[in-house]
Amino acid sequence: GKYSGKKNSSETYLKINIEAAKEACAQIRLRNISGIIIIDFIDMESESDRHKLMDELKLLAGKDPVKTTVVDMTSLNLVEMTRKKVRKPLYEQISLPKSDN
């Protein structure tokens, strides 16, 4: 990946998780995913790093025109988010109707 062992591992994990958060939020918007969303991040032991990641996620979610709420992070580094459904997700919009045959 982009980050290697030149820095300490906790700093590397934080950077990777922040990049993952950016991409996850972009994909959620692109695919118009709604409902309860769980994101599994690399384990971080530092409470400070967890807060930095949550702050970044809340900032990213705030940029979404659809109401998106970052709920919490569990001890397993799973982040729960909710996103309001305003229209069908992308996969439903482009799916062909099933035939009756």
Regions found by a protein language model. Give the residues of each.
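Conserved glycine-centered short motifs in functionally critical loops
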Residues: K2-N101
